Amino acid sequence: MSAAFTISKKRKFVADGVFYAELNEFFTRELSEEGYSGCEVRVTPSRSEIIIRATHTQDVLGEKGRRIRELTALVQKRFKFAENTVELYAEKVQNRGLCAVAQCESLRYKLLAGLAVRRAAYGVLRYVMEAGAKGCEVVISGKLRAARAKSMKFADGFMIHSGQPAVDFIDSATRHVLLRQGVLGVKVKIMLPEPKTRQKKSLPDIVVVLDPKEEEPITKPYTVINQPVEAAAAAGQEVVAEQETAVAY
């Protein structure tokens, strides 16, 4: 986010966080039908690059790039960027089954289409587990059948809920679905096979057993006699004398 005046590091972090939250909310509202699943902001000295991750990148770009240009103009006007200092790019989600936002949006549209709650939830669970996830949890709450609200939880596989591994390995998303009987809350949590960060981390309960080193062959023990320097010199002279005698013969 560009600023003409210098601010402290603390205020800079807060301003960047607010900017990212507002930008993410804006894209969530504008690109919900295109399968929006997150964005990444890269700031360079000359311009700011915003990478939009979605399942349908062609719809994000639009015909001849019209939609992406409209979004660029809206972002530039909303966040007061200077002219030609912000660019938007569309990136396709590599694995939809391991993206909680994409699966949450998929479940949302299934419920809007009138699909049964259990069938929609189990379809998401099956798709996520087939994609290679360690575990998945789907929670749907609201007026599901009767007039009284309740919550239904569907889970499969392995799921952790606390500690630093929950931050590194859990991808979660929450959406709201407006139906005729009221608003439903949808939450999807996915236990990833690898951490979200690029650092190689493992769960604390995983024990890695290293292969044993190859044993060196045991040699026969021997004794080393340390002789004094004078005795060693005399022994050396005797050996030389014996060699000279042998040569003379």
UniProtKB/Swiss-Prot annotation:
Keyword match Ubl conjugation = no
Signal sequence: where? none
Localisation per UniProt entry: Cytoplasm
Which controlled-vocabulary keywords does the entry list? Answer: Cytoplasm, Phosphoprotein, Ribonucleoprotein, Ribosomal protein, RNA-binding
Which biological process terms from the Gene Ontology are attached to this UniProt entry? cytoplasmic translation
Task: Give the matching PROSITE patterns.
Answer: KH_TYPE_2, RIBOSOMAL_S3
Gene Ontology cellular component?
Answer: cytosol; cytosolic small ribosomal subunit; nucleus
Which residue pairs form cystines in this protein? none
Q: Residue ranges of the KH type-2 domain?
A: 23-94
Say what the protein does: Component of the ribosome, a large ribonucleoprotein complex responsible for the synthesis of proteins in the cell. The small ribosomal subunit (SSU) binds messenger RNAs (mRNAs) and translates the encoded message by selecting cognate aminoacyl-transfer RNA (tRNA) molecules. The large subunit (LSU) contains the ribosomal catalytic site termed the peptidyl transferase center (PTC), which catalyzes the formation of peptide bonds, thereby polymerizing the amino acids delivered by tRNAs into a polypeptide chain.
The UniProt similarity line reads: Belongs to the universal ribosomal protein uS3 family.
- Assembly and oligomerization: Component of the small ribosomal subunit (SSU). Mature yeast ribosomes consist of a small (40S) and a large (60S) subunit. The 40S small subunit contains 1 molecule of ribosomal RNA (18S rRNA) and at least 33 different proteins. The large 60S subunit contains 3 rRNA molecules (25S, 5.8S and 5S rRNA) and at least 46 different proteins.
* Listed name of the protein: Small ribosomal subunit protein uS3
Q: Which organism is it from?
A: Schizosaccharomyces pombe (strain 972 / ATCC 24843) (Fission yeast)
Specify the taxonomic lineage.
Eukaryota, Fungi, Dikarya, Ascomycota, Taphrinomycotina
